[in-house]
């Protein structure tokens, strides 16, 4: 079975370090880019009639997000140091993570809220959704 490692911008190092313990499993490094920011830029540009489509800032943001995801996944794979696959998705982050982990044997993610105290506030909204809706076991890592 596959172990899915959520490679989020601020917490990916801790998740990748935790994933090394599952070296015998097939590892999938997952990054999700939120579709809201490029979508808002596309929408704002669409409201400006007469603008040439090549100047749409949403397209540039899409490209920047794809480049960022690629670089982050490459850094995560290098840090992991074992064979793995990578996946870059775009959409509602929490929904994409849950969908990617649907057939997984384990999902590894990291607390991303107020980690000065234990409890529900130590999870950000997307992470809380994933913990509540994942259909596989979840390894919740404390950030260092």
What role is predicted for each listed range?
Residues 11, 77-107:
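Structural beta-alpha unit
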Residues 17, 74, 95, 128:
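Active-site phosphate/pyrophosphate- and oxyanion-stabilizing loops and adjacent acidic/basic residues
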Residues 28-30, 85-89, 139-141:
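General small-molecule cofactor/ligand-binding pocket signal
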Residues 109-133:
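Glycine-rich, Arg-bearing micro-motifs that act as flexible, cationic patches
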Residues 131-144:
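Short, flexible loop segments at boundaries between secondary-structure elements
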């Amino acid at each position: 079975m596959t172990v899915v490692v959520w490679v989020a911008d601020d917490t990916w190092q801790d998740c990748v370090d935790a994933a090394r313990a599952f070296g015998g499993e097939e590892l999938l490094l997952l990054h999700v880019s939120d579709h809201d920011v490029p979508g808002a830029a596309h929408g704002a540009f669409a409201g400006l009639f007469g603008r040439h489509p090549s100047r749409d800032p949403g397209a540039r943001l899409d490209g920047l997000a794809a480049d960022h995801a690629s670089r982050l996944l490459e850094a995560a794979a290098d840090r992991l140091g074992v064979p793995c696959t990578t996946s870059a998705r775009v959409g509602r982050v929490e929904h994409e993570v849950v969908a990617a982990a649907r057939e997984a044997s384990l999902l590894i993610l990291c607390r991303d809220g107020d980690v000065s105290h234990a409890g529900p506030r130590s999870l950000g909204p997307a992470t809380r959704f994933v913990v509540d809706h994942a259909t596989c076991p979840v390894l919740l890592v404390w950030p260092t």
